[in-house]
Each structure stands twice: as structure tokens, then as C-alpha cells.
């Protein structure tokens, strides 16, 4: 909140003029960061995960990427996560895109028979968003976790979160 655009330019090692050429305000900078994170997830799904047959494993990797990417700039990512919850916010569209990405993967998992089809996809997406918000706001030491610790803890929470909506065995 108290970080200025000058601070951002200095940390990014670019001139203030260069920063302002791309981002006219802190809000536009936040939007750019959120859009870049979503683009990275889209690339992950299109490239690295394109041959992964299990949609639940794709969901796991997407959640890992969202959380691991937030660690480096945790305060900023927490602000983005908070702001994109409000329809009035310019960042709200990024939330809708995140929901769409998760919803697509949930629907794939339901079609594969690994997630229960009798549970609305939106309810499962809500569970996953709850997990994401838990990592951002309820894990105070998130920034101190090693990558391995974070993945281990997130995987455990992911499994617990989806336990009630997983099928006993895929159809």
C-alpha cells in the first residue's frame, strides 16, 4: 500500500519513465502482474500439462503454480487476491479468468470420473478458491517455506479439500 511507483522502478532496476510507459498507476501495475500470472498458468496448461491425462493432477499443478508464484511477492499477491474479490475492482476480471481456468479443469475431471459429477463444478471451484485464499491469508509463514515444504503442505491440503468430491474409483 505504501510502496510508490518510484520504489517499484528502483526494485525492478528500470527508469521511472520506462515503468510509466507501461503502467500509468499502481492499479495498472497490479493488473499487469495479475494478467501475467494468469498467462503463465495458461502456458503451463497448454505446454507442460498438455499430455497430462489426469485433470485432477492438472488442477494440483495449477494450484501449486498459483501459490508458489505468490511467495516471491507475497504482500503484493495478497493485495491482488483481496482486490480481485470486488466486482468494482479493475482486478475483478482476473478473478473471473482464474475461476474459468479452474472450472474448465474441474469439468474435465468430472467428465473423466475422478471428481463427482453430482456436485456442481462451481462448488468444487469454490473449494479450490478457498484453498488458495487459505494459503494467501492463513499461512503466515508462507514466505519462509522452502519450495518443497510449500508443495508438501499444499498437496496435503489439496487432497483434504477434494476428499469429499473425489470418486472412489474413476468410471
What are these regions (language model features)?
Residues 15, 25-26, 54, 120:
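Short coil/turn motifs that cap or connect alpha-helices
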Residues 30, 34, 38, 88-99, ...:
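Amphipathic, non-transmembrane alpha-helical scaffold segments
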Residues 61, 68, 100, 104-112, ...:
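C-terminal peripheral helix-coil segments that are non-catalytic and often amphipathic
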Residues 32, 43-72, 121-128:
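Hydrophobic alpha-helical connector segments
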Residues 7-11, 19:
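Append "Primarily bacterial transcriptional regulators
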Residues 67-104, 122-123:
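Short secondary-structure transition hinges
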Residues 1-2, 13, 21-46, 60, ...:
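An amphipathic alpha-helix adjacent to DNA-recognition modules
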Amino acid at each position: 500500500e505504501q510502496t510508490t511507483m518510484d520504489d517499484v522502478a528502483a526494485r525492478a532496476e528500470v527508469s521511472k519513465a520506462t515503468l510509466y510507459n507501461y503502467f500509468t498507476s499502481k492499479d495498472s501495475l497490479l493488473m499487469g502482474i495479475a494478467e501475467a500470472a494468469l498467462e503463465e498458468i495458461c502456458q503451463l496448461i497448454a505446454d507442460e500439462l498438455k499430455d497430462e491425462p489426469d485433470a485432477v493432477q492438472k488442477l494440483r499443478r495449477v494450484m501449486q503454480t498459483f501459490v508458489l508464484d505468490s511467495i516471491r511477492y507475497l504482500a503484493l499477491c495478497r493485495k491482488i487476491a483481496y482486490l480481485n474479490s470486488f466486482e468494482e475492482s479493475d482486478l475483478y476480471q482476473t478473478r473471473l479468468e482464474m475461476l474459468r481456468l479452474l472450472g474448465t479443469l474441474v469439468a474435465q475431471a468430472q467428465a473423466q470420473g475422478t471428481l463427482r459429477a453430482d456436485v456442481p463444478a462451481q462448488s468444487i471451484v469454490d473449494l479450490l478458491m478457498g484453498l488458495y485464499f487459505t494459503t494467501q491469508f492463513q499461512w503466515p509463514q508462507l514466505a519462509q517455506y522452502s519450495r518443497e515444504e510449500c508443495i508438501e503442505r499444499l498437496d496435503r491440503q489439496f487432497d483434504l479439500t477434494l476428499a469429499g468430491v473425489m470418486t472412489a474409483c474413476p468410471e
